[in-house]
Design a protein with these regions (language model features):
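Transmembrane alpha-helical segments of multi-pass transport proteins
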Residues: 368-371, 417-472
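Hydrophobic alpha-helical transmembrane segments
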Residues: 119, 148-197, 367-371, 385-407, ...
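Signature of the first transmembrane helix
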Residues: 5-62, 91, 95, 99, ...
Length: 472
């Protein structure tokens, strides 16, 4: 692949999808006056259950897509057709299960509105198969435009419908939920042409039961890894809904969590951009470079979370034109530090991917996800919805303890970090950074500007002192 092609594809896969996030931020001042914490509560609970089943429904069968493309270049479409049918059937089953659970969970209960809402909210499960195949086929054939612009068009169309329903029709949570419904239906319909027709990938019923069992045996172990991410992000809302916590309180948590999640965007983009250097340094056993790259990503994560936290009140005043939703500002300030350990996850998981020891990934995601569920289940009945804030933070930060308790990561992290005691230093920096940022978020604007300049200067000084420019 030429350098120009690499840059072009990086732009399509990395920059273009972020346009939807930019548009959603611009829309906030226009839509939030017509939304309530109850709307965000309903939306948060519904999307949590839907995300849970979206992660389970593929049954890990996507593992066969890339492998068959390279192993059977002339007939890969036959394998993909079998996978497509199995995914369509499993998504139908899990979509119906999701609808049934939502009918018993959402406050609308067994009514026509409740049934319609559960169906609309479950469509991303029913119609997820085409999008999943498209996410694999277009990068493999190096044709990003069809994938990226279909998803972008669907997302923008969904956001337009959402805006109309919220701003003009005053339909609250219906507007929030309609966005996912419209974008999913649009993408599924377009990919029928781009995937089914253009690549001759059609649903194929496999009569060979032994082959189906063999495919599932390979695929199913991947489900817990995907499920772990959902448990980390959605456990709190699922547990709160089962404990009948007020939907207004669930909405406060959901909105604060959404705003806090923006803090990880910079770190994830940096880690994605540095992935070639991360891969190369580990494969070449250049652990000194690998360690410096980690320090760079972790420092950027700390500085970004600190800056977003201290400026969060101003961000809310600028974007959130709703007094009830503005109460979630302090939640956002805390949760923007939850995934500050994302860099550590990236650098711990990279060796496992390189060595194809993917079973070890369960420790990084599934175990913290289960921890989050258990903490929420235990603490929310006692301390209310605010317990979910700390259970989420603790569960993410628990990834720092893995090198002390799991043999594989004890050896791997010691190899590239040098000394595991540095993990405790990182934890101390995270805690002190969070305490300091939350203490300073209400100081005067001129003081925040000064603090921001100091933080950026420290980041620049660290970058120069460690001579990180030579690595990137």
């Amino acid at each position: 692949m030429s350098t120009r092609k690499i840059v072009t594809n990086t732009f399509y896969y990395g920059v273009v999808p972020k346009l939807t996030m930019l548009v959603s931020i611009v829309m906030l001042p226009l839509t939030t006056p017509f939304l309530s914490t109850f709307d965000y509560g309903v939306y948060g609970v519904l999307t949590s259950y839907t995300s849970l089943f979206v992660s389970i429904a593929p049954l890990g069968l996507n593992v066969h897509l890339t492998n068959s493309y390279f192993e059977m270049p002339r007939h890969y479409n036959l394998v993909w057709g079998r996978v497509l049918l199995m995914m369509l059937l499993s998504s139908l089953c899990f979509g119906l299960v999701n609808m049934l659970i939502l009918l018993f969970t959402l406050p609308m209960g067994f009514s026509w509105e409740g049934l319609a809402l559960c169906f609309v909210g479950s469509v991303p499960i029913f119609l997820m198969a085409n999008g999943l195949l498209a996410q694999h086929i277009f990068p493999l054939v190096e044709r990003p435009k069809h994938l990226v612009f279909t998803n972008l068009s669907g997302a923008l169309l969904g956001m337009l419908v959402s805006f109309v329903l919220i701003y003009w029709c005053r339909l609250g949570y219906w507007g929030l939920i309609a966005s996912g419904f419209v974008s999913t239906v649009f993408a599924f319909s377009v990919f029928v042409k781009f995937v089914w027709h253009d690549f001759d990938i059609r649903p194929i019923w496999d009569h060979n039961k032994r082959r189906v069992r063999r495919m599932l045996k390979i695929a199913l172990p991947l489900v817990p890894h995907t499920l772990g991410f959902v448990l980390l992000t959605s456990s709190a809302r699922i547990v709160m809904s089962q404990y009948h916590v007020s939907y207004d309180e669930i909405g406060l948590f959901s909105h604060g969590s959404t705003m806090g999640d923006y803090a990880v965007v910079v770190t994830s983009a940096l880690a994605l951009a540095l992935m070639p250097q991360i891969q190369r340094s580990f494969r070449n056993s250049d652990f000194r470079a690998y360690r410096k790259l980690y320090f760079l990503c972790q420092t950027v994560a700390l500085v970004t979370s600190f800056l977003i936290c201290i400026w969060m009140p101003e961000i809310y005043r600028l974007l959130i034109r709703n007094a009830s939703l503005a109460q979630s500002c302090d939640i956002a300030c805390l949760l923007c530090f939850a995934n500050v350990v994302y860099s550590f996850y990236v650098f711990m998981s990279a060796p496992a991917f390189i060595e194809k020891n993917t079973v070890q990934l369960l420790w990084l995601v599934f175990v913290p996800g289960i921890l989050n569920f258990v903490l929420c289940y235990t603490l929310i009945p006692v301390f209310g919805y605010r317990a979910a804030i700390w259970s989420t933070i603790i569960s993410y930060w628990s990834q720092l303890s893995i090198p002390f308790v799991v043999g594989y990561y004890r050896k791997s992290v010691t190899q590239w970090l040098g000394h595991r005691g540095l993990i405790l230093v990182v934890l101390l920096l995270i805690v002190s950074n969070q305490v300091l940022a939350n203490a300073l978020m209400h100081v005067a604007v001129w003081q925040k500007i000064l603090l921001s300049l100091v933080a950026l200067a420290l980041l620049g000084g660290f970058y120069w002192q460690q001579r990180l420019g030579s690595l990137v």
